[in-house]
């Protein structure tokens, strides 16, 4: 398939004419030619197979040897309400509104101080907020993906002390050379990339008590739309930090600020240079949020936007989202998991497009198409 073709030339960097030959050569390549043309890394005779594989494995393990003991990763657990509509983790809540096909994920700020050093980070292990909150968030996204395909919209909220979030982010940054801190940062980045590659509409809602700062601010600019309340006292704020400057990259290798402000890089500089909390007018002027309604219009703006979104074809939304989220040059990851998966492997094969009652079949007819609301 096209995913395999992309991996040939973009991942293994096989010469394009050799890849063309390989893809059309019915009998394939023997081992010697496969190695020559870099289709495989090496080839061993059966008599030496076990010995050579052990050597390769040992060499690979030696490259990653840190001399440190890992930390236990207990299962991510949650409590589920009797009706299944609420799933509660330690730092995350997942609420399901089946009637509207809308899921709400709320991430809570930490209530304890951050680890003071590498030893304290190891002592907290998988329970430290910067790791556990993101594991729970990741688990909630996967739960929606595999168990609730009919939910087309995810609204993301946060609650808690913004200063506590920044303190925990700062503690992780201070341990830049520590292997565990590095692995946690990499996991955070992977989780945020899962948001980018989630085939659901994503709205971020910034209102009273929100703590979209530091690493959590990435969820504001990862969303398809963001709504920020313009309150009279200016207490609703967001804050950009060094977390948005490169340590949490997208699949394409650029930051979400770069993807957002591809036309004018000076806006990236302005966002990163913003000092401290930003209220709704300031965030809107910097282009960091989509809409900033006041308290009079807030409820109606959110309601109308949600009702409008869930009424649209889920396949059309998947196509729109996967094209608009990944701005700029493609790479192997974004080709396979972005537009390619959305369009070729999903949209154009679905009854919503080509079925008897699909949108393409009924285009130009007075009859409205009937959609299967399930998402990938």
Language model segments and positions:
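C-terminal alpha-helix plus adjacent terminal tail
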Residues: 13-36, 42-219, 226-235, 270-285, ...
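Conserved phosphoryl-transfer motifs of two-component systems
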Residues: 41-42, 290-291
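CoA-thioester-processing core
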Residues: 1-19, 213-270
């Amino acid at each position: 398939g096209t995913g395999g073709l992309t991996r040939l030339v973009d991942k293994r960097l096989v010469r394009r004419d050799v890849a063309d030959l390989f893809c059309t050569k019915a009998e394939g390549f023997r081992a010697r030619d496969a190695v020559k043309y870099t289709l495989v890394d090496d080839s061993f005779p059966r008599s030496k197979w076990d010995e050579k594989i052990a050597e390769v494995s040992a060499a690979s393990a030696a490259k990653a040897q840190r001399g440190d003991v890992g930390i236990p990763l207990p299962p991510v657990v949650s409590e589920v309400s009797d009706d299944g509509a609420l799933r509660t983790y330690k730092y995350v809540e997942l609420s399901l509104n089946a009637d509207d096909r809308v899921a709400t994920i709320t991430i809570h700020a930490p209530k304890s101080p951050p680890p003071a050093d590498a030893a304290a980070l190891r002592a907290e292990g998988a329970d430290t907020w910067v790791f556990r909150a993101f594991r729970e968030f990741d688990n909630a996204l996967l739960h929606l993906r595999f168990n609730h395909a009919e939910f087309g919209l995810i609204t993301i909220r946060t609650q808690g002390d913004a200063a506590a979030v920044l303190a925990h982010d700062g503690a992780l940054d201070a341990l830049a050379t520590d292997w565990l801190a590095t692995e946690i940062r990499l996991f955070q980045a992977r989780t945020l990339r899962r948001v980018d590659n989630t085939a659901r509409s994503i709205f971020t809602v910034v209102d009273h008590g929100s703590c979209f700062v530091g690493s959590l601010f990435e969820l504001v600019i990862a969303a398809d739309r963001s709504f920020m309340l313009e309150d009279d006292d200016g207490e609703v704020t967001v804050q950009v930090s060094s977390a948005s400057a490169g340590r949490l990259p997208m699949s394409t290798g650029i930051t979400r600020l770069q993807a957002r402000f591809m036309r004018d890089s000076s806006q990236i500089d302005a966002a990163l240079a913003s000092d401290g909390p930003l209220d709704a007018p300031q965030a809107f002027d910097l282009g960091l949020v989509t809409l900033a309604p006041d308290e009079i219009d807030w409820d109606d703006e959110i309601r109308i936007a949600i009702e409008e979104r869930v009424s649209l074809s889920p396949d059309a939304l998947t196509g729109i989202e996967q094209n608009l989220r990944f701005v700029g040059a493609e790479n192997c990851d974004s080709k396979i998991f972005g537009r390619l998966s959305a369009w070729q492997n999903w949209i154009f094969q679905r009854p919503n497009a080509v079925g008897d009652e699909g949108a393409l079949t009924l285009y130009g007819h007075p009859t409205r198409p009937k959609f299967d609301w399930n998402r990938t």
